[in-house]
Amino acid sequence: MVYLVTGQPDLFENPNYKLMSVEESLQLLSSCKILQYDSETTGVDARICDLLCVQFGNKEKDFQIVVDTTTVSILLYKSILEDKYIVGQNLKFDLQFLYNYGIIPRKVYDTMIVEQLLYLGYPSGTISYSLASIAQRRLGIDIDKSIRGQIIWRGLDEQVILYSANDVRWLEDIMHSQLKDCEEKQCKVGAKLECDFVPVISYLEWCGIKLDEEKWLVKMKKDKENLDKARESLDKFITSNPNLSQFTHIERQGDLFSGFNSDPICTINWSSSRQVVQLAKILGFDTTVQDKKTKEDKDSVLEKHLKTQKGINDEFLDLYFAYQEYAKVVSSFGQSQLNMINPKTGRCHTIYKQLGAASGRMSCGSQQPNHALAKLKGIPAKDCTYCNFQQLPSDEVTRSCFVAEEGNLFCSCDYSALESRLGADIYQEHSMIEEFLYKSGDIHSLVAKACFPELKDKTTEEIKKNYPHLRKKAKPIGFSQQFGGSARAIASSLGCSLEEAEDIAAAYLNGFPGIAKFKADGSKAVRQKGYVLMCKYTGHKMYWWDHQVWLDRQKSFTQEFWEEYRTRHKDTGDAIALSVREHFQAASKWDRMALNSPTQGTGIVILKSAMTDFFNYIVDNGLFNRVKIVALVHDEANIEYPINLSMDVVLKECMEKAAAKFCKSLPIPAEAAVGDHWIH
């Protein structure tokens, strides 16, 4: 049965639903343990737009209640929303509109988030997580969403009321279906952790972060100057090299007023990769890479490709990389940040995706326009998008532009050597655990000791003091090996021969038997099971989505197959050769995932657990909207709070306690920095 609660009953009489008073609705809702919840709004930005209606449903009692919040105060339902167990779809969105009224639900189940958890690892676009798609996939039910885009301009009418009610009809059924899968896949603990984090990430977006506009304008001017200087240096590199005259032009014409200039002028547009490719080839660089999607060769001058060719023309690489860096800063972190400032809050509000990567890590930002904010500020919608704070330059000048409000402090708190410490625990690499627990904690020196025979009998303290050059070499080795890198990657980073790099890689695994065992076991497990267990405590898994295809292909590799392959493999366009290449590339990729995903996956579980505890402290102590969570970047938490509170101590304690729950062999300390701006 569909009910409508409204302050204007005379306008909404209809045989398709029944009118109900506020008191009657509260009585019915109070009798339920679980409530399905959704809301319709006047727009997508909770800090600008408002509620149009909210919907409650319950499967056992078979009702849906639509509350017209334009005539009935949502505050009348505060205790219901905060006390009952709420099931919803993409609740991060709905909660922000409730936060505007000081309503803070924390007992929530999000069908979208749990569905994403159950399909972690599937490529973007292969699975839809909309309510309609989930209902069709799990229940075989078609949910009509044709009115969704019309609600903003239609307002509340008969069709919108019935549409809204239908959105809270099937959520419990979806939840029960998902929980069966969670039980089977042993990830119910992970599902609860992710659902508990939904109110936190919603609060993170709702709080936003304050940007000092004057400081930012000064930074923008300096960035533009740096970009101009980088462009001039590249132009000079061309014009001063006679062998590159094809990329110059001499202006023969002039006049008596401006004079005559016979100096060569660079004709390359440094923002055009096509033009830079032509230059790079002439300078001797190999610009050919394989397109990941089409598997066809293409030209590239991306830094990650060119930096592997050091020694060909390092002067050009240094100049070009500097230009690319400044160009990215100017285009991505300039006026767009100022456009993000919400006039109503005076703060920048962005979008976070809770399960933004296959590892379970969050992602940040979106090129989707904020139409409500653009309209409010009177700027084109295309110029009003959401900033990616995870890619924000970490230099002091940039970070110092993000500040605390007057009377507040800004605290940045991050984990010390999170992935190294966590890796030591997960791999059960005893030499690393002992280094952290009883010695200097210098993992780079420990890696150097394992990889370079001349350091075999040296202590890590001696290596750091007397062999800094080898310790420096050990840094990229350790990083590469912990993340499943090949000997070729070591050779590229150190500039050594492949044979020498292979010896170093072998020495690394010999020196760290725990990592070697974990690597071998992980490779075997992922090939057999088709997933990587990223956190053994929560059951978070990364699924090899086309694992069955890989297994079927593996079975087809018979003796007859290999005999045919040997006669045709040199033909790179041959279907058999391509199939073999793809097969072993997939195996190599998942071997790497099996090694490095557990540290990344458990790392983000730790941060989510910590911030959930911190958010609960905020709410339990009446500090909602006084203590703000303003940014989460990888393993770093940033908060803002009144100067008379010691929230840095609370945050540090929450982070260290969370780490202790998931890292049993050694502590992971958190380090807090407090000031009037973003310090880290």
Cite the ranges covered by each PLM segment.
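Conserved "right-hand" nucleotidyltransferase catalytic core of DNA-directed polymerases
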Residues: 1-51, 55, 62-63, 126, ...
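Active-site-proximal helix-loop-helix substrate-binding element of RNase H-like nuclease domains
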Residues: 2-17, 45, 49-183, 193, ...
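Metal-dependent catalytic core segments for phosphate chemistry
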Residues: 48-58, 63, 412, 419-454, ...
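Short, conserved charged micro-motifs
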Residues: 75, 644-651
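Glycine- and acidic
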Residues: 153-160, 209-217, 260-262, 401-412, ...
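Conserved catalytic core of nucleic-acid polymerases
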Residues: 206, 345, 349-350, 355-357, ...
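Short, contiguous acidic/charged loop-to-helix segments that flank catalytic cores in large enzymes
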Residues: 294, 337-343, 355-356, 368, ...
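A common structural junction motif
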Residues: 511-512, 653-663
